[in-house]
A protein has these predicted regions:
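Hydrophobic transmembrane alpha-helix bundles
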Residues: 68-78, 135-140, 167-172
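Extended, charged alpha/beta regions that create polyanion-binding interfaces
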Residues: 120-124, 134-136, 149, 156-159
Length: 172
């Protein structure tokens, strides 16, 4: 089973969702941020899902984040320690690579930490395992989305995620 956090331009999530529904008719979807962010759960494996999405060149879907781990949010300092532990657990993914960290939060999430604090905790864990935190030209991206219950954590390349900007933000 594959889980993805999917992002569209504000107001275009229904169209992005339809693009994915055509590719994965048996998938289930959960709204995270109305009109913009939703979660896809598909029966297919990660490589198959990412391959189909990239091959279809979606118009309305601007960013996808694989969910490799989902941690319950406790609302305390333990959340940052748990995030760092996941980074260390995924050391084979990041070791020796330039790695960007993207942190996004749903409005009203119980995750109490500032984006900068979460990024600092992840960057410190990356350094511990021999990865190089990077802002530009990353080889890998660690993405974290704090929703109403969980930290959704995943890793991939910019190509797999459709963008090297957090949530596929539009560049100006």
């Amino acid at each position: 089973m594959t889980r993805l956090v999917c992002t569209a331009n504000h107001g275009f999530a229904p169209y992005a969702l339809e693009e994915l529904r055509r590719l994965f008719p048996r998938a289930s979807f959960r709204l995270i941020v109305p009109g913009e962010v939703f979660e896809l759960s598909a029966e297919e494996g990660r490589e198959e899902v990412l391959g189909k999405i990239n091959a279809s060149e979606p118009i309305f879907l601007r960013h996808i984040q694989p969910v490799d781990r989902a941690l319950p949010i406790t609302g305390g300092a333990d959340d940052l320690a748990a995030l760092a532990a996941v980074v260390r657990d995924l050391s084979d993914t990041f070791r020796g690579r330039r790695t960007a960290v993207h942190i996004r939060r749903k409005e009203g999430t119980p995750f109490p930490h500032a984006v900068a604090d979460a990024k600092a905790a992840a960057d410190a864990a990356l350094r511990e395992i021999g990865a190089e935190p990077a802002m530009q030209s990353p080889e890998r991206i660690l993405s974290v989305f704090a929703d109403e219950e969980e930290l959704l954590i995943g890793a991939g390349t910019a190509e797999e995620m459709l963008s090297d900007w957090p949530g596929g933000a539009v560049r100006f």
